[in-house]
């Protein structure tokens, strides 16, 4: 399980993002939020029965695949809608580069949940075997998604009529997000 010149595969993939946890890009706290104890959440404890307080003190707010987290990776529904709309209305190669970087970062963040892909990168991509927290690669998606969303906004500002001409694509973007 040890890589030739790097870290142990289990160690590399310990902080893997869950496949279903990817929904946190769209919906915050899909997997419960941070790893902090449930009693630290005023909203959760608002209607809690005090007789179960010892149980609440042992429960974390997070139930995803990682050993723990300070909170989800969240981009937002509106930004994701603009990202998807940007895939339809932004012209040029930058759109495809941003989409590829986004998809690649999401797939790599899955780590142990997508081992054939992860093993390929560990074995053949220089320095990847020394990468400790694979979920942190989502910072790329957190950059590329808003960037394409901003390019979509620029297109809309430059050509306001595009929304009426491409109304079905606008509806599709809303529907997908």
Label each residue range with its predicted role:
Residues 16-35, 96-110, 172-177:
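Hydrophobic alpha-helical membrane-insertion segments
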Residues 80, 84, 104, 114, ...:
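Alpha-helical transmembrane segments of polytopic integral membrane proteins
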Residues 1-82, 86:
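Periplasmic/ER-lumenal interhelical loops and adjacent helix-loop junctions
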Residues 60-73, 104-144, 157:
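Membrane-helix boundary/interfacial segments in multi-pass membrane proteins
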Residues 1-8, 12, 102-104, 168-177:
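Hydrophobic alpha-helical membrane-interfacial segments at the cytosolic entry of transmembrane helices
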Residues 43-57, 82-112, 161-172:
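Membrane-interface helix-loop-helix junctions at transmembrane boundaries of multi-pass membrane enzymes
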Residues 91-92, 142-176:
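Membrane-interface junctions at the ends of membrane-embedded or membrane-associated helices
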